[in-house]
Amino acid sequence: MTARIIDGKIISADLRGRVAAEVTRIKAEHGITPGLAVVLVGSDPASEVYVRSKHKQTQEAGMASFEHRLPADVAQADLLALIGQLNADPAVHGILVQLPLPKGLDSNAVIDAIDPAKDVDGLNPVNAGRLASGLFALTPCTPLGCIIMAKQVHASLEGMNAIVIGRSNLVGKPLVQLLLNENATVTIAHSRSRDLPALCRQADLVFAAVGKAEMVKGDWIKPGATVIDVGINRTPSPDGGKDKLVGDVAFHEAKDVAGAITPVPGGVGLMTVACLLVNTVRAASAIHGLPKPGV
C-alpha cells in the first residue's frame, strides 16, 4: 500500500482562492478592506523570506498589506509603541510580529501587547484561553492548517484516536484544543514520553510536531492512519551537496504504511500563510460585527 499524498500546494491554493472571494464580498457589501500588518525586527534571512511571502499573498488576496521594519537593536519600548499604534489603527485588522525576535527583546511582552482581536498568530494568552474554553478565538495558523489537511481525508474527525507529538504553545497545545473541539480522542506526547512508538500505533491520526528530523519511523504508524507532518528540518545531503528538508516523520518508510500523509516540503508549511489570511478575514469580520466568513 502506498499512502495518498495530502498536497499542501493544492489545498493552500484553494484556501487562498476562497479567502480572496470572501475579501471581494466584504469589500462589495460593507466597504471594508481587511488589513494585515507584519512587523519584522532585524534582518534574519529566513524571516525576510517569510515576510515577503506574506506580503505577496496578502496582496494577491485583495487585502491591504502593511510592513514595518525595525532594526535589530530597537528598544523594547519602541517596539511596544509601534504595536500600540497598530492596535489603534482602524485600517489594520491583523498584527503579526515575525518571530523569533533578536536577543534582548521580550517576546512574551510583545505578544501580550497585541490586541487579542488583531492577534492573527493566535498566541496572545486571551486567545489561548478562549480556545481552551471552546469559545471563538483566533487560532495559531499551523494547527489550523493541520486540521484543514486532516479534513481533506476525513469529513469528520469525531471519535478518532489522535496523537499530537509536541507540546509547544505554537503548535502542539493549540492543536490538541482544536482536535478536542472536533470531538477526537486526543493523546498529547513529546520526545520524553514513554514508549512513544506504542502510543503512535494506536492512533488513527498522527500529528508530528516535535522538531526532530525523521524521528517518527514507519513501524510506528498504524496501517491506514493519516499522518500530518509539521516538522521542517534541514539535514546534510548524503552526497555532500545542498542540505535537504525533511519532516519529523521518516516519509519514505511511513508512506508504505499510512493511508494518507503530508510531504515535506509541500505539506503543512504551505498552509501556514494561507491560514494567516483566513485569520485576518475572520478578525476583520469580528471587529466590524459581521457574520463569521465562509472560510
Swiss-Prot record:
Gene Ontology MF terms in the entry: methenyltetrahydrofolate cyclohydrolase activity; methylenetetrahydrofolate dehydrogenase (NADP+) activity
Pfam families documented for this protein: THF_DHG_CYH, THF_DHG_CYH_C
Reaction(s) this enzyme catalyzes, per UniProt: (6R)-5,10-methylene-5,6,7,8-tetrahydrofolate + NADP(+) = (6R)-5,10-methenyltetrahydrofolate + NADPH; (6R)-5,10-methenyltetrahydrofolate + H2O = (6R)-10-formyltetrahydrofolate + H(+)
Tagged with keyword Amino-acid biosynthesis: yes
GO terms of biological process kind: L-histidine biosynthetic process; methionine biosynthetic process; purine nucleotide biosynthetic process; tetrahydrofolate interconversion
PROSITE patterns: THF_DHG_CYH_1
Cellular component GO terms, alphabetical: cytosol
The enzyme's E.C. designation: 1.5.1.5, 3.5.4.9
UniProt keywords, alphabetically: Amino-acid biosynthesis, Histidine biosynthesis, Hydrolase, Methionine biosynthesis, Multifunctional enzyme, NADP, One-carbon metabolism, Oxidoreductase, Purine biosynthesis
Residues holding NADP(+): 166-168, 191, 232
Pathway: One-carbon metabolism; tetrahydrofolate interconversion
Family: Belongs to the tetrahydrofolate dehydrogenase/cyclohydrolase family.
Subunit structure: Homodimer.
NCBIfam families linked to this entry: PRK14186.1, PRK14188.1
Role, per record: Catalyzes the oxidation of 5,10-methylenetetrahydrofolate to 5,10-methenyltetrahydrofolate and then the hydrolysis of 5,10-methenyltetrahydrofolate to 10-formyltetrahydrofolate.
Official protein name in the record: Bifunctional protein FolD
Organism, as annotated: Rhodopseudomonas palustris (strain BisB5)
